[in-house]
Amino acid sequence: MNTNYFIGLMSGTSMDGIDAVLVDFSSPSPKLVAKHSQVIPKHTLRNLQRLCLPGSDEINLLGQLDRSVGLLFGAAVNELLAKAGISKEQVVAIGSHGQTVRHMPNLDMGFTLQIGDPNTIAIETGINVIADFRRKDIALGGQGAPLVPAFHQQMFASPDTPRIILNIGGIANLTYLPGTNDDVIGFDTGPGNTLIDAWIQQVKDQAYDEDGAWAASGTTDEKLLKHLLSHTYFSQPFPKSTGRELFNQAWLEQQAAEFGYLNEADIQSTLLDVTCHSIAKDTLALSLRGELFVCGGGAFNTELMSRLDKLLPGYKLSTTSDLGIAPQWVEGIAFAWLAMRHHQGLSGNLPAVTGASREAVLGSLFPAD
């Protein structure tokens, strides 16, 4: 009986659902044994979106959502195991990212906050949980993000071939794997799907722009594009990370206020170009050519992929499927891997990426007993 399974739980800034993966690490290449996506109920999603912005009675809302999200994460694990026909006794630990509700690493007392009570997950599943992966890195002077570049390096690096792994979730982040002994570079480029999702939700009450079809029907307004790309984040040096605290619907409405004459589809096209141009600028600053593999929800946006391809003529553009891991499961597997690293007493961060003063074992253990 295999007892070397780890589970990864991930809910990103898009908050489009909880990804749960069961991974076998008994061989050098991880094997994805089972996968499950759990929808976040609408009332919980509304409260999470509310909590991501400053408001009243935040502590009460935070406490209740911490438990609610923990229960959802626990249910996702139980559903995953039922699907796979695997008993809880075969799982070493769950690596839970949690749901980020605030990420502000650049304050004098920088912090990041993920909810989804790991004690609740442990009790609901009967499996030890490793969680709170980001705050050790922040305690060491780092950004606490992105953390997945260490996993990207382990799984996707290729000698003598520069590669970029680009994750496009709510926020987009890239990992530059130089193919040499040089340091891996990784950082958040800026908005991924967060602005295009916010705009289509506001105008059409749709969760996302499928295939980027609405953006494709519009024409980018160069003046608005230039205005949005003038945000100071885009010119900051790395290491850097961001989130919905900077790029959200309120910011979008404020920035677009003087552009009310624009067609709604033209605004969507412009927002998609904010994502594509910010990614392309940072990519070209690292290397003019190479291989670029996309993961995350953005990999399924055909208009986004097409525009990126045009902006990066020196790159061979594809998805992480070509490297053996489907785009939607990369981050979940990464947190299963981080749980395994914690279990083995191994570091999980890359100081060159996060800015931390040293490598460290990430996460805390929450026993099921």
Curated annotation (Swiss-Prot):
Transferase recorded as keyword: yes
Reaction(s) this enzyme catalyzes, per UniProt: 1,6-anhydro-N-acetyl-beta-muramate + ATP + H2O = N-acetyl-D-muramate 6-phosphate + ADP + H(+)
Residues binding ATP: G12, T13, S14, M15, D16, G17, I18, D19
Keywords assigned: ATP-binding, Carbohydrate metabolism, Kinase, Nucleotide-binding, Transferase
GO molecular function terms attached to this record: ATP binding; kinase activity; phosphotransferase activity, alcohol group as acceptor
Function: Catalyzes the specific phosphorylation of 1,6-anhydro-N-acetylmuramic acid (anhMurNAc) with the simultaneous cleavage of the 1,6-anhydro ring, generating MurNAc-6-P. Is required for the utilization of anhMurNAc either imported from the medium or derived from its own cell wall murein, and thus plays a role in cell wall recycling.
Name of this chain's protein: Anhydro-N-acetylmuramic acid kinase
Protein's organism: Shewanella sediminis (strain HAW-EB3)
Encoding gene per record: anmK
